[in-house]
Amino acid sequence: EVGLMITEIQENGLLSFIKIGPIEEKALYGSRVRIQTREKEMVGVITADEDAMKNNDVKGMRIDIGASSKEEVQAQGIMAGDTAVMDGEYTMLHQNRIMAKAADARQGCVLGLVLLEALKGVELDFDLYVGASVMEEVGQRGGTTATGLIHPDLGIVLDGGAADDYKGKDNEVGQLGKGVLIRYYDK
C-alpha cells in the first residue's frame, strides 16, 4: 500500500514526511492518515503552509497529530521512520461499486482465492502457484522474490487498474461496467 514515512519531528510537534510510492500530492492536503508506531496506531491530518497548498508541494506539508511540541510527539511513541497510510474506509456505492483505499491489490487477492476455489479438485498438467506479494509500489520487491524462487514459465498478475472513464470520453481504456480490462506486458 502506498503511504508516507515520517522523516522528522519538528519542535512545534508537526511531522515532516516523504511519500512511499506514487501518491498524488494534490490528494494529500487535508487527508486523514493513520500512523503506525512500534506500539500503537494514531490518527493525524495533513496540513500545509500556503505555498505548499498552492503548489501541491510535499516539502511544505506536515502531519498534525494535535501535539504542540516534539516532546509530546515522542511521548506518544512516534519516531522518524514510522509509516503512515491514508485513513479511508471501505464504502459501498450504488450499482454494486465500491470505494476503498488500496482496492486494486485487495481485488487481486480475492481473484486469486476465487481461482483456487474454482480449481479445487481439478487435475492440472502444470504446476500452479498463487500468491500475494508485497512492496509493489516500491520496486515490485515481493513479486521479484517470488519469481526468483519459483522460476515460472508464465506469470499472470491479478490486480486492479484505473478506470479512465471519469474524463467523460467513451473511448477511454478501463471503463466501469464494460467488462474485464486486460493489460499485458511481455518482457
Roles of regions detected by a PLM:
Residues 1-187:
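N-terminal hydrophobic/helix-forming segments and targeting peptides
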